[in-house]
Amino acid sequence: MTLRNDWTRDEIQALYDQPFLDLVFEAQSVHRQHFQANTIQVSTLLSIKTGKCPEDCKYCSQSAHYDSKLEAEKRIAVDKVISEAQAAKESGSSRFCMGAAWRNPHERDMPYVLEMVREVKALGLETCMTLGMLNQSQAERLKDAGLDYYNHNLDTSREYYSHIISTRTFDDRLNTLDHVRHAGMKVCSGGIVGLGESRNDRIGLLQELATMPVHPESVPINMLVPIEGTPLAEVEKLDVTEWIRTIAVARIIMPHSYIRLSAGRESLSDSDQALAFMAGANSLFSGEKLLTTPNAGEGKDQILFAKLGLTAEKAKPTVAELSVDAMSA
């Protein structure tokens, strides 16, 4: 399949509008051309600074604009982060993601996050951060410290975006992704379904992602988790088949990207998740919590993997581990 960056909305809509089973079959066929069919990349996400975010994202418990009852926490110590990363690796994660509720990191924060990247990288884990907007200098320093991925989601279509966020623009997000790409890091960018958007908005989101100069290496497809106290607390729940359609279309138009099951997975049945894997999802966040929202725990995931015959993608060994293996050979 030829890799394309010129997908039109009409083409993407034609994929969405296929009969459900035809769409899932096509997505699984594309998936098998580029990935091992039964291998899932497992990531762990840790909040390194929680709450009091100045942004007004209407879905988010961490926004200072809403009364979500979330207790804000100061940034956590680097050694605590390293301990959590080591535990994540031992439980089967190959990528460790660190998120801070900032509009953007201040210069005083940079030594803290750079040390964190270096220490987590030394464990043999892929590293990812989501810290808000970046300038080019910050992106380059993160890359030099060893950061593999930077997450900055588009959230929704350009047209629907202003209904969800007013404190940063859609182009602000694209600019940060440009800085990440130019620094040589891998881009992690996706969105959220179930925000009250239309299917046309989901098409618009995927078109933005699939027409970037390089497809994002990782594409999280989140299901809204309604949070009490936020403006979207009472939004009508999206049917799960529409979420699976979105995953399938993402797989077809971005065949080399990891498509990740992210927020909202905790409320899904094993059968729903199996369909998502059939539709081409091959990455997920494991652990009891995603920043501040509930998530399927490691024990549930181990049972699910065993039931479906799935295996976790392996983390890379550290230099020390390679040395021990060489000595015992």
Swiss-Prot record:
Xref: CDD domains: Radical_SAM (cd01335)
Keywords for the protein's UniProt record, in alphabetical order: 2Fe-2S, 4Fe-4S, Biotin biosynthesis, Iron, Iron-sulfur, Metal-binding, S-adenosyl-L-methionine, Transferase
Record: residues binding [2Fe-2S] cluster: C97, C128, C188, R260
Enzyme class, first EC level, given as a word: transferase
Keyword 4Fe-4S: yes
Reported cofactor(s): [4Fe-4S] cluster; [2Fe-2S] cluster
Single GO term (MF): 4 iron, 4 sulfur cluster binding
E.C. numbers: 2.8.1.6
Cofactor-binding details, from the entry: Binds 1 [4Fe-4S] cluster. The cluster is coordinated with 3 cysteines and an exchangeable S-adenosyl-L-methionine. Binds 1 [2Fe-2S] cluster. The cluster is coordinated with 3 cysteines and 1 arginine.
Pathway given in the UniProt record: Cofactor biosynthesis; biotin biosynthesis; biotin from 7,8-diaminononanoate: step 2/2
Record flagged with keyword Glycosyltransferase: no
Family: Belongs to the radical SAM superfamily. Biotin synthase family.
Role summary: Catalyzes the conversion of dethiobiotin (DTB) to biotin by the insertion of a sulfur atom into dethiobiotin via a radical-based mechanism.
Subunit structure: Homodimer.
Name of the protein: Biotin synthase
